């Protein structure tokens, strides 16, 4: 052991499953494989998936990641991450891969930010399952006015919408009602009604001659066409007689 380089000694101290044999080789006590005293080969082996799977879970300190990663209550053989709401296998390489991932780092930074501001932390996965309006209310730090999360207009808005009027678009005299006396007596209302009928009568007088002229024009055209046909047929007969 004293003959080994300093960097190789430090590496073996950090990996108790690698031991120096009498043949001056490095042996892995997990699978019995032997390696030469080469630091690069040992680093390559320890970074591989086989070594991570062989390492017993009992020697790994899972409590160092509490309270974010705890034992699952639904699945005793697995762990549960409170920040990402995901289950993890009780294996060191699974936990290490999760805590070094982008999802966990993003959730951890958000959790620390909420702790500093004094706001309750809500995981992103839980926010995605909530309705959109509920997420907005939670982000503002208040609860929704409606219990079922649906929007409903207030009474003042309903009253304002129901009082629609056209008086602001047209003159006011168009909306004045006639008095009972004007309706019974022959006042201005009868005169307007007479004028209305007079206008219709004049329209009828103008339209009637026009219809008669059209009829005359149509009748003259048929007579003229009949005369032309009669003249042609007579001319042909005269030519045949000759």
Curated annotation (Swiss-Prot):
Composition-biased stretches (Polar residues): 144-153
A Pfam family: SURF2
Start-end of Basic residues biased regions: 224-242
InterPro entries: Surf2
Location of region: Disordered: 126-242
Highest rank taxon of the organism: Eukaryota
Residue ranges, compositional bias (Basic and acidic residues): 130-140
Biased composition annotated in UniProt, kind: Acidic residues: 156-166, 190-206
Family statement: Belongs to the SURF2 family.
Protein name per UniProt: Surfeit locus protein 2
Organism encoding this protein: Takifugu rubripes
Gene that this sequence comes from: surf2
């Amino acid at each position: 052991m004293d003959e080994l380089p300093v960097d190789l000694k430090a590496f073996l101290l950090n990996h108790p499953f690698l031991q120096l044999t009498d043949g001056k080789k490095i042996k892995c006590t997990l699978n019995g494989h032997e390696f030469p005293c080469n630091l690069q080969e040992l680093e390559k082996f320890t970074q591989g998936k086989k070594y991570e799977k062989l390492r017993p879970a009992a020697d790994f300190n899972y409590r160092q990641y509490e309270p974010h990663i705890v034992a699952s209550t639904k699945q005793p053989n697995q762990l549960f991450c409170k920040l990402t709401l995901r289950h993890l296998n009780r294996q060191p390489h699974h936990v290490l891969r999760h805590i070094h991932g982008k999802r966990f780092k993003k959730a951890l930074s958000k959790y620390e930010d909420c702790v500093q501001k004094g706001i309750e932390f809500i995981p992103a996965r839980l926010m995605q399952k909530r309705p959109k309006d509920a997420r907005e209310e939670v982000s503002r730090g208040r609860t929704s006015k409606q219990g079922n999360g649906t929007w409903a207009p207030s009474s003042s808005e309903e009253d304002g919408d129901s009082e629609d009027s056209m008086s602001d678009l047209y003159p006011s005299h168009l909306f004045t009602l006639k008095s009972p006396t004007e309706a019974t007596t022959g006042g201005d209302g009868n005169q307007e009604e007479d004028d209305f009928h007079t206008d219709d009568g004049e329209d009828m007088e103008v339209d009637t001659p026009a219809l008669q002229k059209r009829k005359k024009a149509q009748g003259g055209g048929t007579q003229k066409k009949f005369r032309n046909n009669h003249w042609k047929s007579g001319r042909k007969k005269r030519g045949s007689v000759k």
